Amino acid sequence: MGCGKSCIGKILSEKLGFKFIDLDIWIEGQEGRSVRRIFTENGEAGFRRIETAALGEVIEEEGDMVLALGGGTLTSAAAATMVHERTRCVYLKAGIDTLVFNLTNWPGDRPMLDGNPDSKTLSRRIGELMSQRESTYGRTAHIILDIDGKDYDTVSDEIIALAHILDS
């Protein structure tokens, strides 16, 4: 959440000539309602069930693509297994300061960060989420890339280079 997955994904997809899919946007199109509304009406557990089913559909139907997942997608064991076994997963690893900066400057609509928190509260909340998710991200990813201090174009080039190494 807040590491630039969608921005980096769009750049990467252009460089690779693949389509780009943001899973949250795909879900909104399929469901006819916003992620926030799904969270409100179905709760987080309900959203995660919808998200995991959508992930399976996208992986099955869409072919070559760059797919941006929500920060909590991999909290579902089924989703994490699917991603690890059927895709090449890149963990864009950012420190708390980078995430707080990005989320403060480009807040978006993020149900997991409701209440428009101040930077201290945001930093604490991001730390909590990172500690809950870090091990799953690490186990699921085929590539772990530290992105602190790097521009998105550089990150996309590094992903391409690392993916080529995996292919050799």
Identify what each model region corresponds to.
Residues 2:
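Walker A (P-loop) phosphate-binding loop of P-loop NTPases
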Residues 6:
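Walker A/P-loop
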Residues 85-134:
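A glycine- and Lys/Arg-enriched "phosphate-lid" helix/loop adjacent to the NTP-binding pocket
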Residues 15, 101, 131-168:
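NTP-dependent small-molecule kinase module
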Residues 71-73, 95-97, 150:
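Short glycine-rich anion-binding loops that position phosphate/pyrophosphate groups of nucleotides
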Residues 62, 86-87, 140-141:
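Short, well-ordered alpha-helix to beta-strand connector turns
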Residues 22-84, 127:
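ATP-dependent small-molecule kinase phosphotransfer cores
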